[in-house]
């Protein structure tokens, strides 16, 4: 019987799930919006909310707890420096899951997982800067 079983297995081992959510969290922190399947997005949203709550605490223990989950130092740095300040007046509900249709290959339901009050002008800014640097390096 499946009584009191809280999370989806997503057809993965525990270590694979843990690594996948760590990578998804790092991507969500970097881009502030990711496209994934609906079940993954629904599982990821509460995990990301907990990470933002840790960032709002801002102390060393919270930073180490976040680093143990995300395992990406630049993502944790952005989490604490940017999101901790951005969401200091908001009590929970830091993520939004928006259904986005179905994937053509296998008809899997797709969703957009995004941070509320995200900086829309920053979308793709890091990619544009990296691309410009690559072009400059190729020319010079």
Swiss-Prot record:
InterPro entries registered for this protein in UniProt: Ribosomal_bL17, Ribosomal_bL17_sf
GO cellular component, one term: cytosolic large ribosomal subunit
Alphabetical keyword list: Ribonucleoprotein, Ribosomal protein
Stored SUPFAM superfamilies: Prokaryotic ribosomal protein L17
Sample GO molecular function, one term: structural constituent of ribosome
UniProt-listed GO biological process terms: translation
Record family assignment: Belongs to the bacterial ribosomal protein bL17 family.
PANTHER family noted in UniProt: LARGE RIBOSOMAL SUBUNIT PROTEIN BL17M, RIBOSOMAL PROTEIN L17
Summary of subunit composition and partner proteins: Part of the 50S ribosomal subunit. Contacts protein L32.
Protein name: Large ribosomal subunit protein bL17
Natural source organism: Hyphomonas neptunium (strain ATCC 15444)
Gene this protein is translated from: rplQ
């Amino acid at each position: 019987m499946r009584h009191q079983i809280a999370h989806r297995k997503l057809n993965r081992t525990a270590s694979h799930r843990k690594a996948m959510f760590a990578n998804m969290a790092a991507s969500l922190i970097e881009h502030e919006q990711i496209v994934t399947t609906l079940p993954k997005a629904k599982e990821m949203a509460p995990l990301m909310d907990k990470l933002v709550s840790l960032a709002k605490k801002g102390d060393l223990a919270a930073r180490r707890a976040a680093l143990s989950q995300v395992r990406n130092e630049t993502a944790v740095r952005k989490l604490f420096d940017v999101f901790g300040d951005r969401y200091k007046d908001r009590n929970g509900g830091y993520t939004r899951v928006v259904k986005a249709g179905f994937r053509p290959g296998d008809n899997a339901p797709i969703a957009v997982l995004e941070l509320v009050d995200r900086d829309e002008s920053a979308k793709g800014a890091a990619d544009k800067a990296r691309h410009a640097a690559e072009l400059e390096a190729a020319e010079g």
